[in-house]
């Protein structure tokens, strides 16, 4: 029964639409009606600016972390339960009950779960992600590249079967949630964040 209750709470925490809340309350903008329509960090960054984007990213990470920490903080259960409970937060973020069972792509919330389970692994994953975002200026490409790399690290360096399994599942889920991005990447129409080497290359090309 405890696990069922924690799964429900984790889903409800994960379902909190950070981007919608920040957009409506502080910018009088419904992020779902602007840019790509996604409620996550990247679209918030593009539409509302870096401050709003950073706040939404932190909120989405914390959603995953707080939800996943329930077993260890409240019931002193094995740390491995954090990954199980955390998956419910990802479902909440992706299919939010508060906004008609729609949501974001769960990259930041997934990172939050990793933080709850293994902070060192979270830092490694974050460093890889930031490096890829800086190199490509495309969060979608960075996400779809970082997760497979992180999965390999879990398998071969940490040799943690549960972490490896969850990382692999998250990789598949991230690719599934980025279907529209993959189509835009193939067509050369994927938007860049105004940051990093990819953005600079595009700016130089536009000036020629």
Curated annotation (Swiss-Prot):
Its GO CC terms are: plasma membrane
Top-rank EC class of the record's enzyme: transferase
Record keywords: Cell membrane included?
Answer: yes
Identification of the protein by name: Glycerol-3-phosphate acyltransferase
Q: Which family does it belong to?
A: Belongs to the PlsY family.
Tell me the leader sequence span: none
Keywords carried by this UniProt record: Cell membrane, Lipid biosynthesis, Lipid metabolism, Membrane, Phospholipid biosynthesis, Phospholipid metabolism, Transferase, Transmembrane, Transmembrane helix
Encoding gene (name): plsY
Which superkingdom is the protein from? Bacteria
Organism of origin = Lactiplantibacillus plantarum (strain ATCC BAA-793 / NCIMB 8826 / WCFS1)
Q: Which Pfam families match?
A: G3P_acyltransf (PF02660)
């Amino acid at each position: 029964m405890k696990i069922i209750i924690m799964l429900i709470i984790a889903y409800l925490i994960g379902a909190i639409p950070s981007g919608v809340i920040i957009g409506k309350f502080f910018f009088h903008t419904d992020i779902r009606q602007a840019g790509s329509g996604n409620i996550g960090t990247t679209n918030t960054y593009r539409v509302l600016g870096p401050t709003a984007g950073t706040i939404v990213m932190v909120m989405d990470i914390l959603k995953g972390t707080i939800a996943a920490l329930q077993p260890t903080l409240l019931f002193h259960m094995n740390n491995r339960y954090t990954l199980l409970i955390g998956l419910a937060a990802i479902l909440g973020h992706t299919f939010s009950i508060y906004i008609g069972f729609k949501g974001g792509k769960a990259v930041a919330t997934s990172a939050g779960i990793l933080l709850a389970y293994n902070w060192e692994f979270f830092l490694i994953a974050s460093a890889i992600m930031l490096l890829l975002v800086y190199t490509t200026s495309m969060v979608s490409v960075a996400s779809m590249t970082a997760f497979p790399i992180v999965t390999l690290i879990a398998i071969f360096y940490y040799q943690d079967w549960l972490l490896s399994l969850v990382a692999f599942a998250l990789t598949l889920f991230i690719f599934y949630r980025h279907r529209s991005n993959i189509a835009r990447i193939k067509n050369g129409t994927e938007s860049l964040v105004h940051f990093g080497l990819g953005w600079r290359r595009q700016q130089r090309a536009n000036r020629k």
